[in-house]
Swiss-Prot record:
Disulfide bonds: none
GO molecular function: GTP binding; magnesium ion binding; uracil phosphoribosyltransferase activity
Pathway as given in its UniProt record: Pyrimidine metabolism; UMP biosynthesis via salvage pathway; UMP from uracil: step 1/1
Name of the protein described by the UniProt record: Uracil phosphoribosyltransferase
Names of required cofactors: Mg(2+)
Gene coding for it: upp
GO BP field: UMP salvage; uracil salvage
Length: 207
């Protein structure tokens, strides 16, 4: 599996804002949106393009556009904070949804929503989730995508734990992962350390 860790001072500054416990909900959402744009730019750096004929106010010329815009799949609820910015950068992308809660006793994923095309053959898929902790939610999501025929899967997250990276690689060895940081590991409650807390709660408030 390809693993790309974004090394850029602007990304690091926004990650610092996300980590800081003093950052409020609105500022957290803003920093997450800005980091999402960085992740999308990096993830599409080598995306296939096609030529398109256009006219400027002065002359005819040729430009580029993505040859095959992806399906964006935010993992709810934390991934909701990434989808608008990703869709703004990729306006022709389609959007699907996977909703997964976490059982706080077992730390296992509890799926509650799925809205995806039946056939994903030939369609690039970009999964959006700020956190890759145990990998339970992400492996459930990629297993679902693979079962629908997806072969081109890119995962965007802000912070990952080594355990989650390993779980994703086992589930989808041909996937690509783009993240801003790979942290030390997980605590006893299976939260990433140092991490940034519960990304859903920090965006939208406690459940």
């Amino acid at each position: 599996m390809e693993v790309h860790v974004i090394d850029h001072p602007l990304a690091a500054a926004r990650l610092t804002a996300l980590r800081d416990e003093r950052t409020g909900n609105a500022a957290f959402r803003k920093a997450l949106r800005e980091l999402t744009l960085v992740l999308v730019y990096e993830a599409t750096r080598a995306a296939p393009t096609e030529s398109v004929a256009i006219r400027t106010p002065l002359a005819a010329t040729t430009g580029l556009r993505l040859a095959n815009p992806p399906l964006l799949v935010p993992v709810l609820r934390a991934g909701l904070g990434m989808v608008d910015e990703a869709h703004a950068a990729l306006p022709e992308a389609r959007v699907g949804f996977v909703g997964i809660a976490r059982n706080e006793q077992t730390h296992q994923p509890v799926p509650y929503l799925e809205s995806l095309p039946d056939d994903l053959s030939g369609l690039p898929v970009m999964v959006l989730d700020p956190m890759l902790a145990t990998g339970g939610s992400m492996t459930f999501t990629v297993d679902l995508l693979l079962s629908r025929g997806a072969t081109d899967i890119t995962v965007l997250c802000v912070v990952a734990a080594p355990q989650g990276v390993a779980a994703l690689e086992k589930a989808a060895p041909n996937a690509r992962l783009f993240t801003v940081a790979i942290d030390d590991g997980l605590n006893e409650e299976a939260y990433i350390v140092p991490g940034l807390g519960d990304a859903g709660d920090r965006q939208f408030g406690p459940r």
